[in-house]
Amino acid sequence: TELGASNIEIGRRMVSFTGDKEMMYKANFYLRTAIRILKPIKHFEAKNADEVYEAIKSIAWEEYLDTNKSFAVDAVVFSNEFRHSKFVAYKVKDAIVDYFREKNGERPSIRINNPDVALNIHIAEDKCTLSLDSSGESLHRRGYRQEAVEAPLNEVLAAGMILMTGWRGECDLIDPMCGSGTIPIEAALIARNIAPGVFRKEFAFEKWNDFDQELFDTIYNDDSQEREFTHKVYGYDNNPKANEIATHNVKAAGLSKEVILKIQPFQQFEQPKEKSIIITNPPYGERISTNDLLGLYQMIGERLKHAFAGNDAWILSYREECFDQIGLKPSVKVPLFNGALECEFRKYQLFDGKYKEFRTENKDRDFKPRREDTRPRRNSERVEYGERRERRNFDDKREGRGDFKNRDRKDRGNEERKEFKPRFKREEKSVSYTHLRAHETDS
């Protein structure tokens, strides 16, 4: 709602909402937990492939495509009538190609990677929705990641976990097993309220016929929502290579001032001097081999009990036997999917003295997820939505992000700034937009 959306409805692995074109741009740019934003262009019913073909062919495709552009179709199918999603995608492609061939004898090309127009068809039994994908590459690919360790945490999941805790930068945040630094980086972005889309080189809607460059420039270059962060985010790992990778990623995000990294095993974790929160994703033993996985979780429990008193710790894992080794009673259990793994995100309140006394003193700290525009959701969002920015570049040596206004396209390989040459300004057009769907993480 803070972004201006209306008619918000939470569904299964998706959220629908309505708004104008500006709302669509903002949804892509600001939402931390969305995987993609889809704009539905046709709803219909079909019981077989021929009916899908005819429905797609009836669309006035010159409004969205021309023969000089490429397109691709992604199909998501949950239906007894349609068992093969690839076959559905082929029928949609055939309908579009035949539409143009019959119109002018020419056809647009099909390109799987980075097409000019990306389409999505969703079928649930006989209910079909064809949408324009306004995001393109998955929104979890922020653009700051230079390298990754084995089995890195998805950026969208990391952001969702942080938002679930209610933390917004009120105290120090610690990830004692940070790997390539995803949780620390996402935490610093949340604390500073920096839009996750600021690192992206491109969104799919920038190739649309009605793309409003001036409008998107205004959205991109508006940093008025950013805020100061008076605490720190700490990321520790016992692997020197992981620390090196995390350092590169933090620097690429321009967050070296906010994020402090250190090579340190969890066994050496000591009681913080200031109020802190731990959010971490230890190894599960699924894709990462751990010689003594249960011993690792037992050690985690011991360090929390003896070196984190008076604070809260949130841990993501999927093995019950691992959680058992922690030896602490969780106050909150949140089911999450980390890829295909059914995990749980558990909160542990560490305290000194008697538990009853602690509960009395901390009544106001009971888990109450915040409801706001960046709240964690399942797997989608929908908007009904009305310029081109100079891509933002971060100089890691400066004091803060408020030191400049004009931002250039981010060079992923270094911190240099590239000259941005804006396109010609488009004339204002009156266009009617319908719903958008934003797919979000399985969490």
State where each predicted segment sits:
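Flexible, glycine-/basic-rich loop-and-beta segments that form/coincide
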Residues: 138-140, 350-371
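Non-catalytic nucleic-acid substrate-recognition regions in nucleic-acid-modifying enzymes
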Residues: 1-115
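Conserved small/polar residues in nucleotide/adenosyl-binding loops
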Residues: 434-441
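Charge-dense, low-complexity intrinsically disordered regions enriched in Arg/Lys interleaved with Asp/Glu
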Residues: 365-433
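A short acidic, Gly/Pro-enriched loop at the edge of an enzyme's catalytic core
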Residues: 270-277
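Class I S-adenosyl-L-methionine
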Residues: 76, 101, 122-164
